[in-house]
Structure formats: C-alpha cells, structure tokens
Amino acid sequence: MGVIHEETAYRKPVPGGDPGAGSGAADHRDSAGRLSRWEATGDVRNVAGTDQGRSVASGASRVGRVRGQELARGVRAGNGGSAGTSGVHRPEVGSGRQEKTGNQTMKTLVTANQKGGVGKTSTLVHLAFDFFERGLRVAVIDLDPQGNASYTLKDFATGLHASKLFGAVPAGGWTETAPAAGDGQAARLALIESNPVLANAERLSLDDARELFGANIKALANQGFDVCLIDTAPTLGVGLAAALFAADYVLSPIELEAYSIQGIKKMVTTIANVRQKNAKLQFLGMVPSKVDARNPRHARHQAELLAAYPKMMIPATVGLRSSIADALASGVPVWKIKKTAARKASKEVRALADYVFTKMEISQ
C-alpha cells in the first residue's frame, strides 16, 4: 500500500468542507475550560520539573505547570510543515511490528476522531464483541468521559477505572483485570470503565501521561490479553495523545457530513506526528459510518473521499441503522437483536470486524 504524507494530506481539499479547515493553530479546552495551544510543528517537548510518579488523583497541583505551555508539539493538529515526518501508513498485512511483552504479544487499537457522534464508540464496542466471540482475551479501555462504551459493556466491568491507568502500576499488577484461577487461555472481555476523575488526566503533562499510560498498557499485556481496544474522547487532548503513543493501530470512523469530514486532515496530521515518537503506529484508515444510502449528499461525499484518500478508506461501510442503537442500549452486539432489519447491520459490522481482525494479524 502507499504512503500518505502529512504534507500531501494538507494539500488536498477537504471534500464537502472548507479548503482552509485545519490550516491554522487550534485551541482546545479541557473539561475545566483550561486552554492549551496545539501546534503541528516540532518534536515532543519535555516539560521541566515533571514528577513521573504522579497520577491523575494529584493532578490538580499540576494545572499551572501545563497551562500556557506547548504540550507535546509533535502531536498538534494545526498549521505546520511535514519535514521529518514519516507519514501515515496503510501497510500491507505482515509489515507491522508489535512489541513483545513476556510471552504475550498484545495488539492495541485506538478508535479516534476529533468529531463526536460519528460511530466511534459503536465501532469499538462491536469489535470487542466480535473478538470476544472469536475466543480472544479482550481488554477495553474507555477514555471518553461520556462513558458510552462503559454503559454498553457494563456487564463486563472489572471494577478498575480508566483514571487509574494514568497512575503507577501496582507492584503485582491490577488484580481487577487479572484472569481468574484456572481461566488460563479462556476467552474473556474485561472493561476498564470511564469515571469522572478521568478528566484530571488532561492536567498531566503529556510526558507524564505517556509514560504512565504506556506502563499500564504493558501491564495488561503481561496479564495475557490478546487485544486492547481503546475508546477516546472526540478532542485532541492528553488522553487521546497518550493512547496513540501506546497503540499499534488507529481506526477513524467518520460520518459523511461536512463537519465530520472537515476534521479528517487534522486527524491525519495528528497520526503522522505521533508516528515520529511511535513508529509502530499504523493507521488502518477511515470507515464511513451512519451512511444513509438514500441520501445523495452521503453518496457524493463518499465518492469525493475515495478520490481524495484512496489508500486511506477502508473497503467497508456501516449504514445508518436503528438496530445498532437498539443493540448498544441493550448491551449486546447488533447480531443479537431479533429483528429482520438487524440482519443487514450485522453483515456490515461483521465485515468491518473481519477486515480489522485481518489487518491486526491477531493470533488465535
């Protein structure tokens, strides 16, 4: 497959949107309304005086440290050149490399989009159900303060909260996610749920968050999980950046509407810049979600995206189907919904899961 460079992505007009979208530096506020400057150029900057042992529980004292600083300039989505970036890759199966941890190779995938309501959580939840039914040991981390994935997967809650992953790993690992005695290689689905304290992660420096979260991902790998799926908030914050730095793959569901499409260049640039520090990160691509086949605007936008980003569009789409919403509300995958209308949705979601499973080269 080809390579899409950051500079190339920026030169392309955004189909259905403002050609200038994403061309300027963007300001992002955290949940407390604090302002951080996000820029595309440069490397990740170390924040002077950071305490690597701090967790989000003590994050309030760190607000002044991060306010007004250019946190991790290498992951900013804004105006900047592409010199030195390795680009966003859509490699062929078999070309990726994952980190071996003990005897277990855990694959980590992040669903990310800087626009909400595009089917990101729905995609992640159905991947979790599909992989679980394949007999895999699946960890799901909900880093979205909205907690929608946590709601759907509440029957699989471990009692471990996502905010804890921005703190030190206990000496013996997290007992909440450890396999029960005798489970061994048995399939399991373990939810690390969102909680209100998670918002404090945005107060950490990115260097702290990256190290702490990365160490916790390695701890999960040591507990025998085959795959870790991470849902993220629809904003470019510390939580999303830390997840991308720890991930092997990233998938971006998109809605075929102008506002959603406008964020594509920013997401592509963010991923390209993260790859400067996390070379193993692979962009699986964009998957059109909530597609209305009867809407000519959706058809036009999809054709424009395919023309603009032919190597970055996943050959699978998920339609706008009420049965998917029914499934999410019921805490089950759409193929468990006993409605005729759910059959087509099930086929689409399963096709997407097959594609992602193949690209991730997950061993069974």
UniProtKB/Swiss-Prot annotation:
Q: Which parts of the chain are coiled coil? A: none
Residue stretches of biased makeup (Basic and acidic residues): 1-10, 26-42, 89-100
Q: Which UniProt keywords apply?
A: DNA replication, Plasmid
Could you tell me which Pfam families the record lists for this protein?
AAA_31
Q: Among its keywords, does the record have Isomerase?
A: no
Q: Where are the transmembrane segments?
A: none
One of the protein's GO biological processes: DNA replication
Q: Which InterPro entries match?
A: AAA_dom, DNA_Partitioning_ATPase, P-loop_NTPase
Does the keyword field hold Iron?
A: no
From the UniProt entry, list the residue stretches annotated as the region Disordered: 1-63, 75-102
- Tell me where on the tree of life, at the top rank, the source sits: Bacteria
**Similarity comment text for this entry:** Belongs to the ParA family.
What is this protein for, i.e. what is its function? This is one of the proteins encoded by the trfB operon; it is involved in plasmid maintenance and replication.
The protein depicted here goes by the name Protein IncC
Task: Identify the species of origin.
Answer: Escherichia coli
User: By which gene is this protein encoded?
Assistant: incC
